[in-house]
């Protein structure tokens, strides 16, 4: 991370203009070393060049950088600026909210994602089930768990399977937790 940031600085000092791929790489480096200051400079440059609206991967990298630097509110701002969002974009925000203990925001974001007809994936389901376990909400978790079970996803992904068992256990549905546990291919 630090080496990439130093290389980027040298590139700028040499008068070379970064392209979107360079920005994505440096944002990942900023996220990995939690360099908010450099990340904010990059964000300003991206906005100055008007690159955010047309590059989804750049938007995803910015959301990720702000989440990893501890600023979910800034990640939300970037998210709202994006004209196009995919499951990775939504997952970045949902994962970040859960990571920072903002469970209600994660669930609200998931609801918006579903209302915009974006299909959840294993990452989405894992985060939402974790959120439901944190707040002990079987009412919200059960329909999500039903989708996961219907698709057989919990048998294909060990993390999702464990999170499903954990959610049921934290919600007090120990019998259901044991049933799911018994169906896991790897224990």
Identify the residue ranges that each predicted region occupies.
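Pentatricopeptide repeat
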Residues: 4, 19-24, 39, 54-55, ...
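Long hydrophobic segments that form regular secondary structure
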Residues: 70-85, 165-187
């Amino acid at each position: 991370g630090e080496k990439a940031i130093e290389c980027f600085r040298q590139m700028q000092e040499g008068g070379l203009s970064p392209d979107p791929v360079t920005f994505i790489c440096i944002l990942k480096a900023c996220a990995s070393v939690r360099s908010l200051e450099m990340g904010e400079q990059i964000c300003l440059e991206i906005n100055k060049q008007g690159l955010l609206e047309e590059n989804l991967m750049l938007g995803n990298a910015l959301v990720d950088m702000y989440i990893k630097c501890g600023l979910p509110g800034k990640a939300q701002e970037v998210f709202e600026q994006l004209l196009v969002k995919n499951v990775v974009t939504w997952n970045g925000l949902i994962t970040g909210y859960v990571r920072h203990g903002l469970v209600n925001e994660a669930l609200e974001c998931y609801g918006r994602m579903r209302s915009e007809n974006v299909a959840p994936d294993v990452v989405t389901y894992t985060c939402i089930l974790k959120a439901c376990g944190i707040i002990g909400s079987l009412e919200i978790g059960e329909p999500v768990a039903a989708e996961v079970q219907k698709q057989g996803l919990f048998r294909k992904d060990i993390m999702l399977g464990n999170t499903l068992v954990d959610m049921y256990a934290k919600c007090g549905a120990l019998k259901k937790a044991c049933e799911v546990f018994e169906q896991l291919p790897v224990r």
